[in-house]
């Protein structure tokens, strides 16, 4: 039976209504500081926590409830004779319910230029301690940490048999979930402030919170949720959806891939993408030129895909985009008239992107664990020419473009390009010659000046195939024990080849 409750909340919007319910049920209310004042202002009878502890709040409120008269009242097991005798001997009254919410550490931490001395005061100590104590003793104590549960709990208090052990366990699980999340936020924030921070800590406790529930996952029979990183606001959590249906699991994954690809470039760029694989990447002097060049790489695969830009979409481009069926269009800005044109397609998802990609690490789930690695952000501006045939400044720029593009193609990956536009892409093949054949064959009607490979050539067969299609220069990491064979083949056909010394495998 619930006889005494302790209420201590930072957010006080719903505490009054809940306290009124408790009072109507004859439940004694204990409360702290500002919460007690709020309740008293609303004519609710409250016992200040100092009257229970016989000790004042000290250190400007740092110590309020860290006291045996509070912790003992929460942790005592009602069916344990020794526990209850201890309470009786020490004149400690049991506490049967607590409602606690915590200092808003995250909200303050996410403010710009927050002072560490100020932030430290928003690390709650007493609140998590009470929550953990009550959750540990869930069979005897109701622990409430989520204001969305208050209405249901208020109803159940009127029929106590509904506060069964399973429901209490649910509340306890939720409570420990909150305190673990809260501590994770603090740990990760403090680690990020270190001069020599630990990039890979002993325990992985990255704080993610539920953003929204999706209709389904990758397939209709799979359930899915989107969780966002609490301490950062990345591109996929800060965009504005200006039109269209809700985003699906696949939409978000593909949009993330397209946005990362198009932001690889400083110049005006466009990326057309389907099923997380680029089907066209291009630069242009204008947005429309970049789009037309990217589209022409593979006008078949783009049907039902995504088009991303790193510049404002104008009317001319909007009119072209409207001609085909697309799932998503992404850009940092839209001309007002261009947006009106695109909105004529009611189901077209139009995203206004408010952030460039910011993630430092990426996570891959494997059965029983998670792989964590740094995001592949390394760029090159120079390379080693390993053939007698040298490269002009124009070809050098083309090679650097193709190298950036191939980084975003699933391995084994080959990109053929001309005029800073992909003309053929070979993706996800189990061997490199198949990827090369795919890319070269797709480029043959459009032509290609250079070929980029995400990893080294184990044999000279890719060079032989490239020569058949008139490739002038090749960029690859180098590092194969048979590099000499590929270099000799290039010399045979007058093809320039450069080594970057860096690989760009992409398996997800």
From Swiss-Prot:
Name the GO terms of the biological process aspect: 'de novo' IMP biosynthetic process
Q: In which pathway does it act?
A: Purine metabolism; IMP biosynthesis via de novo pathway; 5-formamido-1-(5-phospho-D-ribosyl)imidazole-4-carboxamide from 5-amino-1-(5-phospho-D-ribosyl)imidazole-4-carboxamide (10-formyl THF route): step 1/1; Purine metabolism; IMP biosynthesis via de novo pathway; IMP from 5-formamido-1-(5-phospho-D-ribosyl)imidazole-4-carboxamide: step 1/1
**Name listed for the protein in its UniProt record:** Bifunctional purine biosynthesis protein PurH
Determine if Transferase is one of this entry's keywords. yes
Q: Does the keyword 4Fe-4S apply?
A: no
To which protein family does this belong?
Belongs to the PurH family.
- Name the reaction it catalyses: (6R)-10-formyltetrahydrofolate + 5-amino-1-(5-phospho-beta-D-ribosyl)imidazole-4-carboxamide = 5-formamido-1-(5-phospho-D-ribosyl)imidazole-4-carboxamide + (6S)-5,6,7,8-tetrahydrofolate; IMP + H2O = 5-formamido-1-(5-phospho-D-ribosyl)imidazole-4-carboxamide
MGS-like domain span? 1-145
**InterPro entries given in the database record:** AICAR_Tfase_dup_dom_sf (IPR024051), Cytidine_deaminase-like (IPR016193), MGS-like_dom (IPR011607), MGS-like_dom_sf (IPR036914), PurH-like (IPR002695)
Gene3D superfamilies linked to this entry? 3.40.140.20, Methylglyoxal synthase-like domain (3.40.50.1380)
- Which one Pfam family would you cite for this protein? MGS
MF annotations from Gene Ontology? IMP cyclohydrolase activity; phosphoribosylaminoimidazolecarboxamide formyltransferase activity
- UniProt gene name: purH
Q: Which domain of life is it from?
A: Bacteria
- What does the record say about domains? The IMP cyclohydrolase activity resides in the N-terminal region.
Supply the EC number(s). Answer: 2.1.2.3, 3.5.4.10
Q: Which GO terms describe its cellular component?
A: cytosol
Q: Which UniProt keywords apply?
A: Hydrolase, Multifunctional enzyme, Purine biosynthesis, Transferase
